[in-house]
Amino acid sequence: MESHGKTHQKEHDNDLSPKPITLSKYSKRVELKTLLDRSDRGAGLAGKRVVIGGWVKSARAVKKNSPPPPLPVVAAPSPSSGGDQAHTTANIRCTEIIQSKMNIFKRFFDVLSGGGKTYPIFDKTELAGQKAVPPPEYVFYFLISDGSSISSLQVVVDSALSTVPATQLMALGTCIVAEGVLRLPLAASAKHVIELEAEKLLHVGTVDPEKYPLSKKQLPLHMLRDFSHFRPRTTTVGSVTRVHSALTLASHTFLQYHGFQYVQVPVITTTTGFGEMFRVTTLLGKTDDKEEKKPPVQEKDGFSIDTVKAVIKEKTRLIDHLKRSDSNRETVVAAVHDLKKTNDLASQIEMKQKSKTGTLVKPEKLDFSKDFFGRDTYLTASGRFHLESYASALGKVYTFGPRFIADKIDNARHLAEKWNVETEMAFAELDDAMDCADEYFKFLCKYVLENRDEDMKFISKRVDKTITTRLEATASSSLLRFSYTEVISLLQKATTTKFETKPEWGVALTTEHLSYLTDEIYKGPVIVHTYPKAIKQFYVRLNDDKKTVAAFDLVVPKVGVVITGSQNEERFEILDARIGESGFTREKFEWYLDLRRHGTVKHSGISLSMEQMLLYATGLPDIKDAIPFPRSWGKANN
């Protein structure tokens, strides 16, 4: 695995000898990582002509050098002024000459260094395009990012190249495609090694600074969630996304190398047994035509629903404005709270309206035989059932896809839609599954450190300074394993901590229990296995003691459970009995029982939550920042 993993290491160029510039595949431009993620940081490419594209991260404008002003003319002293006056006049002339000369040198230095006086806001006459006064000419200095790397490229643009007004060209988020020549910075103190002197602007995609949410100062992550379609343009979310991509590639790399076959499993399923699930139906909203419909209730306490909706729209617009402005968080929070109360009022009016019209259909009254699929269907919460059928033929299989849980919980660790990597292995028992989880987890930690080092350095500075040390320690050590019974005993010995849920045998381990175990006692990831059968799913294999089942959780500090796994029940009689004990309809599991009727075999598997893994790898505190478009209870913005 080591030799194979090395072939995938270092996505950027770390060779000592600089390579020639190559165009981005399927594009007529050069990716910035090709220029900047080299051993020489691009210095060896000076003089090369390239086309680059990206979005403006910062911008400044410097007025072009104008001719030096003429020396001041001072009248000669009159003969009657006396010697003292003549001496004073001579001193003034000398001082002014020195100041004038120093101003010339200062302007010359500004041109060479790219510094000088900046003009982020332009005169009204220039913006209005008045012809009476010729607009001043500027040199623009942009920092451009194209998302291929943590690094940005400085692009120098003469204002004469652009037909777009200066304020629009310089707005944060503007997309620019430029052709020019790479050069070494003129300023010796420049932080960057290479820059592009633009000769052509091939494309300018402007933004409206008044409406673009990223136009203002850096927004915190929790506020960026309202603009999930724009937040990947921020440096932090861009780095997190590249780490996410690396974890995905690492998962395929590890599993393919170890002989797992990739299988697609359905998102729509008839199988239940995984907690609250989303129902799939086309019947909601349909009513009996014979049912008398009463006129809707339009008002509550003198407020019409249309009026309330108009107020909601205005309050939403105000909150958007506050978020883009420099308003403090307390003001924004107060406005959001006020909007919530208005939304609650609208909900009350609509609920009363629906209760009066008699058009609301309850799910239990629906005839699902008339539904699209002719029966109850749900969004899947796990793909392991379907993987079992392929493991019974191919031996080792895996899948990667969305999983849906309808728990009405809104906190930093819950999502309604998550993405899981799931495996299933025939001829494997619980210890085999734990070994697989152990090696897979450590491989992910090592892969991220070796292949996304620049992003990890940035995230370490911006989010969590301990992530690199934590991942290095995890990748190089063996994970400790404890039975559930041993964990309960450890928790009961904790004399300095009082738990809200008393640790007793048979009680499900809570977040505070797991946090104490990983953050306080062992300060690292651990595996907890052999749980009481009452707190795990019915399909997990029953142990010989008839009290425990063959399940495990891989738990990490600050995050909680990242990987779950189990050896599933292969014995028909026991599985059939446990389905009945759990209160499920046997009919829904006939296909699953068939796998035990015909050619049954011992098998086990694991399920990794990609979002939880990303939290551990980056130190992010909230799972809603670990997925591109978060869906949680009450929130689905786009």
Swiss-Prot record:
Segments for region (Disordered): 1-23, 62-87
UniProt-listed GO biological process terms: asparaginyl-tRNA aminoacylation
Alphabetical UniProt keywords: Aminoacyl-tRNA synthetase, ATP-binding, Cytoplasm, Ligase, Nucleotide-binding, Protein biosynthesis
One GO term describing the cellular component: mitochondrion
A Pfam family of this chain: tRNA-synt_2
InterPro entries: Aa-tRNA-synt_II, aa-tRNA-synth_II/BPL/LPL, Asn-tRNA-ligase
Top-level class of the enzyme under EC nomenclature: ligase
Catalysed conversion reaction: tRNA(Asn) + L-asparagine + ATP = L-asparaginyl-tRNA(Asn) + AMP + diphosphate + H(+)
Biased segments, Basic and acidic residues type: 1-16
Enzyme Commission number(s) of this protein: 6.1.1.22
Family per record: Belongs to the class-II aminoacyl-tRNA synthetase family.
UniProt xrefs under NCBIfam families: asnS
Full protein name: Asparagine--tRNA ligase, cytoplasmic 2
Source organism of the structure: Arabidopsis thaliana
